[in-house]
């Protein structure tokens, strides 16, 4: 039986994060973690964090080997140079964009095409660990999805290149509407930073 814990607060933290948009079929897009690309964010249900110590930074092709997994997030996980488990979000769109600029972007996840990378707001709850620029949480779900026309990405060895989505933006917005949260099409890359 799992031990009952009284939550620290009732309202979720609202942060910013980046997702990959993956086309599993022509009519089904899903959000995936930009760092743990194989982690799909399910529609209409919360994502629960797991300690993935053995597959840290899989989208960049780096595998970190560690001890046994534990409940996530954990205060001690990540100390001494580890990955620090949990669902990540930054406190501001600016910090999220800074985090994104030099990050590798895969073109496929498990054989499905990555059609875009997007920013958005995410609700975090359960056990939440605060850091200087954001949080790591036990549970998360998109609160708003922001679709820019392009995102500056690192692809292969080229850092700072611009990639256009491989599907029309309106189609991406329609298919991501299944998450049941506001989906915003943006006119320019900087627009999410003004909100």
Residue ranges and their predicted role:
Residues 40, 89, 111, 162-165, ...:
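Intrinsic-disorder-associated interaction segments
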Residues 90-91, 120-125:
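Short His-Asn-centered micro-motif
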Residues 1-83, 101-114, 126-128, 149-156:
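ADP-ribose/NAD+-binding catalytic cleft of ART/PARP-like enzymes
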Residues 134-195:
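Active-site-proximal loop/hinge segments that shape catalytic or ion-binding/gating pockets
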Residues 83-91:
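A short, exposed loop/beta-hairpin motif centered on an aromatic-Gly-Thr core
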Residues 93-106, 168-175:
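A short, charged, amphipathic alpha-helix used as a generic interaction element across diverse proteins
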Residues 120, 130-135:
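Conserved inter-motif catalytic segment of the P-loop NTP-binding fold
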Residues 114-116, 139:
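A short, structural micro-pattern
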